[in-house]
Amino acid sequence: MSKFYIENINLLNSEKKNNILSELNLLLSNYSAEERISWALSHLPHTQIMSSSFGIQSTVLLHLIIKKKPDIPVVLIDTGYLFPETYNFIDFLTNKFHLNLKVFRSTISSAWQEARYGKLWEKGIEGIDFYNNINKVQPMNFALNELSVQTWFAGLRRDQSKSRNLLPYLSIKKGIFKILPILDWSKDKIKDYLKENNLDTHPLYNNGYSSVGDTHTTKKHMPGMLEEETRFFGLKRECGLHEN
């Protein structure tokens, strides 16, 4: 399927668009992560970014993509509440890989938010959703518009949570192609790739964290816990960036 034809999927009605996406996802399911990235770089619209939380295993997708497109913009949404170790990790990887880092934040500072709304993360699911919208969803939407993004690479995996079990490799959200190259990777495959390529993991990994977000809504992984229970007090897994 030609790049020209794929770019024009958005002009089709929903039924035709979904049929083509189903065919493309079947194709991508037979590819390796490296092949998916190469295919996307060649066939999808060329105003491309990747997003990264610079979390526990974020180095994997960063390494896979920058090998093929070193100057790709790497979008980070900074809530102002990341762990100090995360900020240090961002600086370290940016310098090591010469990343084209693009940082976006809420238009309201964290201090001003607390003065205006209090500690939203302590106000149940509604407070968390409002917090995520201000600090993650709105800045990401601004980034997508500011950078005129047509194709978005992200590192979601099906084994991370129940909410990600049925995700496709390729989707279209608000006219933007979204590609998930390591969607089918297991934790073991992630660990093997990190080891084989001598890549760094987040400093908090060795302190018992399996997933890292904001300081106030991230817990250490305790025996018997699911990874998704370490975030947002177990009330939810997604922050809104990757929801419909």
Curated annotation (Swiss-Prot):
**Location within or outside the cell:** Cytoplasm
Instruction: Identify the catalytic residues.
Output: C239
Which reactions is this enzyme annotated as catalysing? [thioredoxin]-disulfide + sulfite + adenosine 3',5'-bisphosphate + 2 H(+) = [thioredoxin]-dithiol + 3'-phosphoadenylyl sulfate
Example of a GO MF term: phosphoadenylyl-sulfate reductase (thioredoxin) activity
What EC number(s) are associated with this protein in UniProt? 1.8.4.8
- The record's top EC class is oxidoreductase
**Gene3D superfamilies reported in the protein's UniProt record:** HUPs
Q: Which GO terms describe its cellular component?
A: cytoplasm
InterPro entries the record matches = PAPS/APS_Rdtase, PAPS_reduct_dom, PAPS_reductase_CysH, Rossmann-like_a/b/a_fold
One of the GO BP terms on file:
hydrogen sulfide biosynthetic process
Role, per record: Catalyzes the formation of sulfite from phosphoadenosine 5'-phosphosulfate (PAPS) using thioredoxin as an electron donor.
The family assignment reads: Belongs to the PAPS reductase family. CysH subfamily.
Indicate what this protein is called per its UniProt record.
Phosphoadenosine 5'-phosphosulfate reductase
- State the organism of origin: Buchnera aphidicola subsp. Acyrthosiphon pisum (strain Tuc7)
Query: Which gene is this protein's source?
Result: cysH
